[in-house]
């Protein structure tokens, strides 16, 4: 049983490294304007995470559009705004499919 646990930990670490490599490639290709290739890298990364039954890393999860799956580069194919109407939050708009993602900002309690 202990051997299986070590194997799973090692394979999850390898999967994290591969996801990181794929997302860096997706970022590079998206900056060059090859959005179809960057979408393929994003799909491959998601498949690896699902296969290993691990959550997608948070720093990459927010850089992917949930609707169309494109890699978001702020200012190029997405728009980022801060709003503070009802509750303070960041609004990320994908300019390819016009979907909106809201991320709440945690405020300090006094």
From Swiss-Prot:
One of its GO terms (biological process) is tRNA 5'-leader removal. Keywords: Cytoplasm, Endonuclease, Hydrolase, Metal-binding, Nuclease, tRNA processing, Zinc. It catalyses: Endonucleolytic cleavage of RNA, removing 5'-extranucleotides from tRNA precursor. It is an enzyme of class 3 (hydrolase). Binds 1 zinc ion per subunit. Pfam families: Rpr2 (PF04032). Zn(2+) binds at residues 65, 68, 94, 97. The gene is rnp4. InterPro entries: RNP4 (IPR016432), Rpr2/Snm1/Rpp21 (IPR007175). One of its GO terms (cellular component) is ribonuclease P complex. Part of ribonuclease P, a protein complex that generates mature tRNA molecules by cleaving their 5'-ends. It is found in: Cytoplasm. It comes from Methanococcus maripaludis (strain C7 / ATCC BAA-1331). This is Ribonuclease P protein component 4. Belongs to the eukaryotic/archaeal RNase P protein component 4 family. It comes from the Archaea. Transmembrane segments: none annotated. Consists of a catalytic RNA component and at least 4-5 protein subunits. Its main location: cytoplasm. HAMAP family: RNase_P_4. GO terms for molecular function: ribonuclease P activity; zinc ion binding. Its EC number is 3.1.26.5. The lineage of its organism: Archaea, Methanobacteriati, Methanobacteriota, Methanomada group, Methanococci. Its cofactor is Zn(2+).
